[in-house]
Amino acid sequence: MNNLKRIKVIAGNWKMYKDKNEALEFIQKVNFSIPNSKEVETIIFAQSTLLDVLVQNQGPNLKIGAQNAFHESEGAFTGEISPLNLVSLGVKYVLLGHSERRVLFGETDQLVNLKLLKALQNNLSPVLCLGETLETKENNKTKEFLEKQLTQALKDVPQEDLEKILIAYEPVWAIGTGKTASPQEANQTIKQIREKVTNLYSAQVVQSLKILYGGSVSSNNVEAILEQNEIDGVLVGKASLETKDFLNFTQAAVKLSSNCCQHFDKKC
């Protein structure tokens, strides 16, 4: 399957970095340098305490996402983040199933599924994170592991809602370690993920499904990653904290898009 019709996505996960002033400074610097959303889709996932001010100051080509949401819209759940309230702030995207949530907070595939269903119910676009550990990789169980994660996370998700979902493949062994899957290896794994979703739904609906790669993405390897046929974008961690690096990622996506247009004699 080719991805020529799918706009590339550059997503930055700020994790628990930046205070209000630092976040505003970043947004003000990048707002008018981010490429048109028709060329590349650009998202920043920030701490919940920053979401309101970032949404109020985001430029026309930048979207703000949350890093987590609860599996109920409201109620007596002290400290949790309501998906309903995220929408009221103007947030469009939410990260779900990130490996740090799974490892540090014990989130299971079943819990990720509940969060995914509630996010969709509240008209949020979830970015579903999947990824295997080093042990799983070394035991040659990556395909089976990811298929299980995927099947459980997408349980009871109707086909018509699949278009709202993005998937991010983030091998746990590559997150924040400086290690990364080779572009070809990442491409092959993402192809397998796409094939599994095809089996769960249909080939037609999967044509528009965007699957990102994350795991020690940097300015040095982003072009090689984005060039891969099955990879629709990147989810970047700490490397997205600097304005120069973040804009470099977006420009790499635009450059690739322009090259594809020229190669196939299409208008960009």
Curated annotation (Swiss-Prot):
GO terms for biological process: gluconeogenesis; glyceraldehyde-3-phosphate biosynthetic process; glycerol catabolic process; glycolytic process. Substrate binds at residues 13-15, 176, 216. It is found in: Cytoplasm. Pathway: Carbohydrate biosynthesis; gluconeogenesis; Carbohydrate degradation; glycolysis; D-glyceraldehyde 3-phosphate from glycerone phosphate: step 1/1. One of its GO terms (cellular component) is cytosol. GO terms for molecular function: triose-phosphate isomerase activity. The active site is at residues 98, 170. Keywords: Cytoplasm, Gluconeogenesis, Glycolysis, Isomerase. InterPro entries: Aldolase_TIM, TIM_sf, TrioseP_Isoase_bac/euk, Triosephosphate_isomerase, Triosephosphate_isomerase_AS. CDD domains: TIM. Its main location: cytoplasm. It comes from the Bacteria. PROSITE patterns: TIM_1 (PS00171), TIM_2 (PS51440). Gene3D superfamilies: Aldolase class I. Its EC number is 5.3.1.1. It catalyses: D-glyceraldehyde 3-phosphate = dihydroxyacetone phosphate. It is an enzyme of class 5 (isomerase). Belongs to the triosephosphate isomerase family. PANTHER family: TRIOSEPHOSPHATE ISOMERASE. NCBIfam families: tim (TIGR00419). Involved in the gluconeogenesis. Catalyzes stereospecifically the conversion of dihydroxyacetone phosphate (DHAP) to D-glyceraldehyde-3-phosphate (G3P). Homodimer. This is Triosephosphate isomerase.
